[in-house]
Amino acid sequence: MFYPDQFDVIVIGGGHSGTEAAMASARMGCKTLLLTHNIDTLGQLSCNPAIGGIGKGQLVKEIDALGGLMGMAADKASIQSRILNASKGPAVKSTRVQLDRTVYRKVIRSALENQTNLSIFQQPVDDLILKNDLVVGAVTKMGLKFHAKSIVLTVGTFLDGKIHLGLENYSAGRAGDTASISLASQLRKLPLRIGRLKTGTPPRIDARSINFKNLKIQLGDTPLPLFSFLGRQHPPLTQKPCHITYTNEKTHEIIQKNLERSPMYRGIIDGIGPRYCPSIEDKIIRFSDRSAHQIFLEPEGLTSNEIYPNGISTSLPFDVQLKIVRSIQGMKNAFIVRPGYAIEYDYFDPRDLKPTLESKHIQGLFFAGQINGTTGYEEAAAQGLLAGLNAGRLARGEEGWFPLRNQAYIGVLVDDLTTLGTQEPYRMFTSRAEYRLLLREDNADLRLTEIGYQLGLVDENRWCRFNQKVELIEQEKQRLRSIWIKPNSDNQIDQIIKSPLSRETNGEDLLRRPEVNYSLLTSLKPFLPSLENNEAGMQVEIQIKYEGYIVRQKEEIAKQLRNENTLLPLSFDYSLISGLSNEVVSKLNDHKPISLGQASRISGITPAAISILLVWLKKQGLLRRSA
C-alpha cells in the first residue's frame, strides 16, 4: 500500500482513555496508531473543567506512577488546586484541580505528537476487520484499512450518541461532534451484551453577566498540590477562585412546573444516568425535602469568560434553563453561552471482558472508558492506560497484566467492572476500596512505579527519581530510629508531648504520638534537619504513625490472596460440577470468572460454592495458582 497500514496497536478514539492507551502502547515500544475523528479535540474536557476528587485523585496519581500523562497535563493546566478531606486521614485525602481547558488540550496534543512510536490519523472509524473471533484491523469512513495485532476501542459517548434538549433530540457524539453511527451498528452484530446509558452537562454562563459580590469565594490551597510525582516541571499558571451559590424554592418551583418538558420524565430517554452526578431535575425529585442545592461556579480558563455551574446539569428546554439559571443568587442577569443537554449512548457489558480489558469473545479487541459503563475522565484514563499496556503486550506475545484490588484503585475499578458489571455510569470513590489505607494518593508511586518500570511504561528519569526517594525514606526512618531521648532531658520535647516520657524513647516512637508530626519533630534540635523532599517526609510520618494498621491490613490481604490466585478455566460448563445450585451455575457460566477470588465477589456465589469449586479443582488436577 502507498500509506503505512501495519501497526502493532490501533487505538480508536482520542479522549482521555484513548490518549492514555496510545501513549502506554507507544512508550512500551509498540508501533501505535491513534485514529480520531478530529485531531483538534484530542484530550478535550467534554464536561467539567476539573480533574481529581474523592477516589478520582487516587486514580490520577496511579496513572502518573505508571508513567501516564493525565497528572502532568493537569498540573500544567491547573488554575486552582485543592486537597479534599484535608482534615481527615491519609486514606481519603484526594487532590482536585480546576483546569484551563485550552491549555490542557494543548498539553495533551503536544505530548501525543512528540511521542516516539505513535502516529495520529484523522478519520472516523466505521468498522472493524475480523477473522472469525480475531480482530485484525479497522476501516475508516473513507475506506482506508489499517491492520494491527490488537485494537483498543475508546469511543466515549459517540456510539449512536443522541443529544436531548427538551423534547427535541438529534444524533451527536457530544455538542459539535457527529456520532459514530456506522461503527455502533457494526459492533451490535458482535456476540456482546449491549445497553444504553445517559449523562448530562449544565449550561455554560458568561462570567461578565454574573454578580459575584455576595457569593462565597473558594480559593485553592497554598502551596499548590500536584498530581505528578515528578514535581513541578514549570511555573504555575495564574490561580483563579471558584464561587458558591445555591438553588432555592423558586428554582425548584420552575423545575417542578416544567417536568413534562423533561425528556427524562417523559420517558424519551431510555439510558440510565449517573447516580452520583444527577441532573438538577433529578435532584429536586429524589431529594424533595431539601430547599437548596449547592452550585460551584467554576472558571473554564484564563482567557475564557465561560463559567461551568457545577450542580445544575439539565436536559430541560432552553427557555426553562434560562429561568432556572436566573432564579439563582448572583445570576439574575445571567447570559447562557451554551445550553445544557443530556446525551444517550451505547455501552458494552464489561463482564464480557477479562481484567486486562480484552474481550472474552474477540481476541485482540480491548475496551476502555465510557464504552465500559464508567463516568469520569479519571476512570476513563485509568482504563485506557491498562488497555493500551495489555494491547501492546498481546501484540508482543506477552501475558497480560492487571493490578489486584489490594494493589491499586485501578485494580478495584477493573475488578468491579469485569466481575459485577454496571447498570449505571460507574464512578470511583474511596469507599469502593476495602484496602484504602494501603491505596493512598501519597504512596501510588511506591505501589506501582517499580511495576511500571518492569512493564516498560516508566522511563529512566522517573525510575531514577523514584529510587532516590525510596532511599531517602529508608535513611530518614533509620535516622529517627537511632536518635534516643531520655526523660526530662529536653524541654522542647516536654512542651509538645501530652504525657511526659517514662523511659528512653527514640524519634520513631515520638512520631507515633498523635500530637507529633514529622515537621514538628524535625524542627526540634535533637532531630534536625528535616528532609527537603516533602513527599519523602510525609511518607516517613505515615509509614511510622500508621504502621500497626498497615501491618494488619497486609495480613488480611495475605489471607485473601490464596483464593485470588487460584485460577479457574475460562471455557467451562459449571453445570458439570455436582453440588452447585442452579443459581450459582447460571452466574458462573454467565460471568466466566478467571479466579476463585473473582468468583467469590459475584453476587449470589456463596462460601459453600467456593469450597465446592476448590474441591473440584483438586480432584481434576486443575489446581494452579497465578504468580
From Swiss-Prot:
<keyword id="KW-0819">tRNA processing</keyword>
<dbReference type="Pfam" id="PF13932">
    <property type="entry name" value="SAM_GIDA_C"/>
</dbReference>
<feature type="binding site">
    <location>
        <begin position="13"/>
        <end position="18"/>
    </location>
    <ligand>
        <name>FAD</name>
    </ligand>
</feature>
<protein>
    <recommendedName>
        <fullName>tRNA uridine 5-carboxymethylaminomethyl modification enzyme MnmG</fullName>
    </recommendedName>
</protein>
<comment type="similarity">
    <text>Belongs to the MnmG family.</text>
</comment>
<dbReference type="InterPro" id="IPR044920">
    <property type="entry name" value="MnmG_C_subdom_sf"/>
</dbReference>
<feature type="binding site">
    <location>
        <position position="370"/>
    </location>
    <ligand>
        <name>FAD</name>
    </ligand>
</feature>
<dbReference type="InterPro" id="IPR020595">
    <property type="entry name" value="MnmG-rel_CS"/>
</dbReference>
<dbReference type="GO" id="GO:0050660">
    <property type="term" value="F:flavin adenine dinucleotide binding"/>
</dbReference>
<feature type="binding site">
    <location>
        <position position="125"/>
    </location>
    <ligand>
        <name>FAD</name>
    </ligand>
</feature>
<dbReference type="InterPro" id="IPR002218">
    <property type="entry name" value="MnmG-rel"/>
</dbReference>
<dbReference type="InterPro" id="IPR026904">
    <property type="entry name" value="MnmG_C"/>
</dbReference>
<dbReference type="GO" id="GO:0005829">
    <property type="term" value="C:cytosol"/>
</dbReference>
<dbReference type="GO" id="GO:0030488">
    <property type="term" value="P:tRNA methylation"/>
</dbReference>
<keyword id="KW-0274">FAD</keyword>
<dbReference type="Pfam" id="PF21680">
    <property type="entry name" value="GIDA_C_1st"/>
</dbReference>
<dbReference type="GO" id="GO:0002098">
    <property type="term" value="P:tRNA wobble uridine modification"/>
</dbReference>
<dbReference type="Pfam" id="PF01134">
    <property type="entry name" value="GIDA"/>
</dbReference>
<keyword id="KW-0963">Cytoplasm</keyword>
<feature type="binding site">
    <location>
        <begin position="273"/>
        <end position="287"/>
    </location>
    <ligand>
        <name>NAD(+)</name>
    </ligand>
</feature>
<comment type="function">
    <text>NAD-binding protein involved in the addition of a carboxymethylaminomethyl (cmnm) group at the wobble position (U34) of certain tRNAs, forming tRNA-cmnm(5)s(2)U34.</text>
</comment>
<dbReference type="InterPro" id="IPR040131">
    <property type="entry name" value="MnmG_N"/>
</dbReference>
<feature type="binding site">
    <location>
        <position position="180"/>
    </location>
    <ligand>
        <name>FAD</name>
    </ligand>
</feature>
<comment type="subunit">
    <text>Homodimer. Heterotetramer of two MnmE and two MnmG subunits.</text>
</comment>
<dbReference type="InterPro" id="IPR036188">
    <property type="entry name" value="FAD/NAD-bd_sf"/>
</dbReference>
<dbReference type="InterPro" id="IPR004416">
    <property type="entry name" value="MnmG"/>
</dbReference>
<dbReference type="InterPro" id="IPR047001">
    <property type="entry name" value="MnmG_C_subdom"/>
</dbReference>
<keyword id="KW-0285">Flavoprotein</keyword>
<dbReference type="InterPro" id="IPR049312">
    <property type="entry name" value="GIDA_C_N"/>
</dbReference>
<keyword id="KW-0520">NAD</keyword>
